[in-house]
């Protein structure tokens, strides 16, 4: 593609198309695409979703966008509002740098503690019942702000909230870390 933003849109469109295809459903069986990205007006998600014949909910939650799409999609299915949802997100290192830090065109030197935004896209289809992975619970995190303002070290800004959310989840669910095969966080 000619721009980083168009490349991100193409990646997300491809991820959505592949997720629907691998689910064994056709596009007309999808009731909603729930997606987000890091760009202004979530344009990658919006432009990717416009190619599909279903509703679209655009979400923005920075590094936690994919988790938010799963929570919203699961709640809509569990509530009986929809039957099938695509949950998706994307990011592109170069478009994120342009928007949040230093445009690559400036040739700025990156500080050693700066994080690297992934260039990639992912999507899955949520449906009630069936085989495979199950969404059984969600814990919505709260903001824990220690006053970190360094745009090159957002991991330090996000880590307290991520830790607080995990601790809250274990307390509320009565589970322990060893009850899980894998614990991952979208936070840096």
Label for each model-derived stretch:
Residues 182-188:
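Internal helical hairpin/lid segments
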Residues 45-55, 77-78, 100-109:
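A glycine- and small-aliphatic-rich helix-loop capping segment at beta-alpha/alpha-beta transitions
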Residues 1-34, 38-44, 51, 161-177:
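Conserved active-site "lid/cap" helical segment
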Residues 36-41, 63-64, 89-95, 141:
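Acidic, glycine-rich active-site loops and adjacent beta-strand->loop/helix elements
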Residues 1-5, 103-167, 172-175:
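Condensing-enzyme catalytic core mediating Claisen C-C bond formation in acyl metabolism
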Residues 6-8, 55-67, 114-116:
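Active-site nucleophile and cofactor-binding loops and adjacent substrate-binding regions
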């Amino acid at each position: 593609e000619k721009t980083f933003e168009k490349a991100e849109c193409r990646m997300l469109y491809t991820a959505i198309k592949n997720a629907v295809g691998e689910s064994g459903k056709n596009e007309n069986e999808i009731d909603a695409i729930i997606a987000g990205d890091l760009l202004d007006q979530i344009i990658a998600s919006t432009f990717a979703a416009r190619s599909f014949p279903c509703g679209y909910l655009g979400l923005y939650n920075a590094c936690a966008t994919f988790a938010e799409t799963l929570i919203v999609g699961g709640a809509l299915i569990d509530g009986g509002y929809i039957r099938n949802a695509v949950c998706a997100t994307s990011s592109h290192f170069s478009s994120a740098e342009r928007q949040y830090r230093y445009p690559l065109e400036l040739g700025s030197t990156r500080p050693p503690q700066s994080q690297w935004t992934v260039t990639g896209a992912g999507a899955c289809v949520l449906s009630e019942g069936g085989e495979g992975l199950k969404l059984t619970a969600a814990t919505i995190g709260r903001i824990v702000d220690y006053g970190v303002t360094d745009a090159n070290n957002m991991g330090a800004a996000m880590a307290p909230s991520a830790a607080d959310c995990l601790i809250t989840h274990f307390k509320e669910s009565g589970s322990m870390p060893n009850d899980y095969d894998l614990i991952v966080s979208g936070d840096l």
